[in-house]
Amino acid sequence: MSVRIEHDTFGEIEVPADKYWGAQTERSKRNFPVGKERMPIEVVYGFAQLKRGAALANHALGKLSDAKKDAIVYACDRVLNKELDEHFPLVVWQTGSGTQSNMNVNEVVSYVANTYLKEQGIDESIHPNDDVNKSQSSNDTFPTAMHVALYNEVETKLEPALKTLRDTFKQKEEQYHDIIKIGRTHLQDATPIRLGQEISGWRYMLDKCETLLSESKAHILNLAIGGTAVGTGINAHPEFGDKVAKFIAENTGYPFVSSENKFHALTAHDEVVQLHGTLKALATDLMKIANDVRWLASGPRAGLAEISIPENEPGSSIMPGKVNPTQCEMLTMVAVQVMGNDTAVGIASSQGNFELNVYKPVILLNTLQSIYLLADGMDTFNNNCAVGIEPIPENIDNYLNQSLMLVTALNPHIGYEKAASIAKKAHREGLTLKESAIDSGYVTEEQFEQWIKPEDMVEPK
C-alpha cells in the first residue's frame, strides 16, 4: 500500500496515500478498532454545514482571508455533494466528545481545500486546526453537527413517512366508515364499533405524534456553536456563534439559531432526550397498530380474520401455503429497538459531568438509528401492508351477530342487572341473545328488535 507521512503533536504517522484524512484520523482508526458502527455520514454532512458556516463567519469577522474562505467552502460543498464519503472511516466508539470525528472533517476539508488553492495558483495553505477549526472546539462542534443532522433527518425522512402512513389510514377510515363490527376490550367482546372508527384511532395516534414531533424538533434548532471548550466562548468572536447559525440556516433552509446558554448546550442533551421521547411515543403507537392489524388478520380459518392483508411471501419452510403477517412483525421489532434506544439515550444524556457530556456519539448513533428505523419501517409497512388492508364482511357480521355484548343497549330500558342475566343465560345455555332476552320475560320480541340495533350503538345517543 502506498503511503504518505502526516504529523500531529504526537509526531509522524503513515497514512494511505489515496485517503484525504490526516494524522489524528489515522491514530483514531488504530486506537479504536471497536465494533462496526461507523460515525453516521449524516453527521459528517452536519459537520460540513458547520465548517462551511464557520468559514463564512470567520471571514465576515476579519479572521479568514478571501482565498481560505473560498477554499474551505469549496471543500465543504464537495462533502455535502457526497463526493468524499470514503474519507470518513471512523467508528462511533471513540472519545465521548467526538473529537476524532471533528478532526477527521477538519483534516479532509483542509486536504481538499489545499488542493483547490494549489490548483488556483494561490500561495496560501490551510491548517485543519488553525483555519478549518478556527474559533471552534470539538465540544461545541459535535453537538452542533449532531443537531443539524438530526433535524434534517426528521424533516426529510421521518415526517414524510409518518404523513404517508397517516394518510393511508385516513383513506381507510373513510372507506370503511359504514362497516360495523364488534369492538373488543381486554381481548373480550365489547360493544359495536365502526371499522372506520377503529382505524381513526390509529390515524389519530399518528396525528398526535406528528404534533409532538413538530414540538420536540423545534428544540433541536438550538446550536452549541460559539461555546468553544467549556461554554465561555474562549478564542471565538462574541458574534461568531450567531453568524455561524445564520449561515447554516441560510444554506439548509432550516431556522437554526445559536443556543441562548452555551454551558447547557455542551453539558446537557435534554433536547435530544425529548426528541427521542417522541420517537419512543411513536414506536409505542406503531407497536399497538401493528399488533391490532395482525390480530384482526389472524387466521385464515382459526383466527379472527376480520381483515385481510397482502400476502407478500411464503411464511413457513415446513408448512406449505402458510402466509404470515411479516410486515407487522417487522414493525413491532422496530418499535422494540427504538424503545431500547430510548433507554440508552436517556442514560447517556444523564452523564454530563461538569462542563461537558462525553457520551455524545452514542446519543447520536441511537437517535439517528431510531429515526431511520421508524421512517423505513413506516414506509415499508405502508407500502406492503396498510394500503392493502381490506375487510372480510362475512366474518365481521358473524362476530357482530353472535356477540352477547349487544345486550348493553338494553341497559337504559331494563337496567344493568337484568341485562346481565340475559347475557349470562345466553352464554350458559347456548342461546342467541334474542332467544335469551325473550325467554327471560324482560323484553318482547318487538322491543328487542327496536332496541338492539348495532347501527344505533356506534355513536352517542
Curated annotation (Swiss-Prot):
Keywords: Cytoplasm, Lyase, Tricarboxylic acid cycle. GO terms for molecular function: fumarate hydratase activity. Pathway: Carbohydrate metabolism; tricarboxylic acid cycle; (S)-malate from fumarate: step 1/1. PROSITE patterns: FUMARATE_LYASES (PS00163). The record marks E329 as: Important for catalytic activity. It catalyses: (S)-malate = fumarate + H2O. One of its GO terms (cellular component) is cytoplasm. SUPFAM superfamilies: L-aspartase-like. Its EC number is 4.2.1.2. It is found in: Cytoplasm. Belongs to the class-II fumarase/aspartase family. Fumarase subfamily. Homotetramer. This is Fumarate hydratase class II. The gene is fumC.
